[in-house]
Amino acid sequence: MKRVGIVEGYYGKIPTFEQRKKIISSLSEHGLNFYMYAPKEDPFLRLNIDIDHTENWLREFDDFIAHAQNMSVEVGIGLAPIYKNKTEALKSKIQNFSDRGVKFFSILFDDIEENFSFFDQIETYRAIKDKFPNLYFDFCPTVYAGELIDKNSAHQEYFKEFNNSFPKHEVFFWTGEKVISEKMGISSQEHLQDFANTSIAIWDNYFTVDSCPKKLNLSFFDYLQHEFIFSKDCYLVNLTGMPRTDNLIVDMLGSFYAQKETSYEEILLKHGVDERLIEQINLFNPKVKVNLKKEDKDKIHKIMF
């Protein structure tokens, strides 16, 4: 199955299920088909993977899954088994979500700063795949961007082991040259020459603000080569946690992917962006270097505040 859609995979405020349903509806409207649930702030997916969600949360999740199914959107779950001794708890968590209709699971080993071992990770991954042969799994390595390879000797050794030993038929996530890449195309995979393009799933953090909360990247996907996203079996855009912005991003993604004739300005107006701010919208595009005059700064301040 070709998966194109979004990731709820950022640090920060977790949206409500009603807000998630709106994202699902927008994905469906644009012919996009995938929503990965993997918020960093959900402790039951990461640090406390051995503890179940509450019954009330699970009821809301069941309703969310039913809505997604009605909209022909698949929901995947991202699980981060930080501790090796939690493999049985991980299996139990997967079984619980599988019983609720989830077929796609991402096993995430990102953002681990110490005591990480590729061979321990792949052992866990294989154990999970062996346990659930009828489900779909992919993998996120600890080194998931080009800039992380040379972070230190441990990261260098990890990437060497990953490059040599990760099964070539399996799918894994990559964010490009940077954790937040401002250019995305075939050159974003230059460190992955030994892997097929279809094995490299993209986790696109361009719009994500959790690691840089005072900065918002916004453009009509002009950082992304259309032939690149179209060549992918899995391309997911990470959202921001800001509901209006996230709905705007989904609208832009759908229009860009389908190459619709809808203009950037039309989409911005549809989502209630002030016409005066649209005149200055390139301020949010990192490719465009803008030197603001004082009167422009004053104008933007009046619009925003």
Residue positions per predicted region:
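Catalytic-core regions of glycoside hydrolase
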Residues: 9, 93, 103, 112-257
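Feature activates predominantly on carbohydrate-active enzymes
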Residues: 1-86, 100-103
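Active-site-adjacent "subsite" loops/lids of carbohydrate-active enzymes
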Residues: 74-116, 219-222
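N-terminal cationic-hydrophobic initiation segments that often serve targeting/anchoring roles
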Residues: 28, 65, 69, 98, ...
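Conserved, mostly hydrophobic/aromatic
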Residues: 27, 97, 107, 128, ...
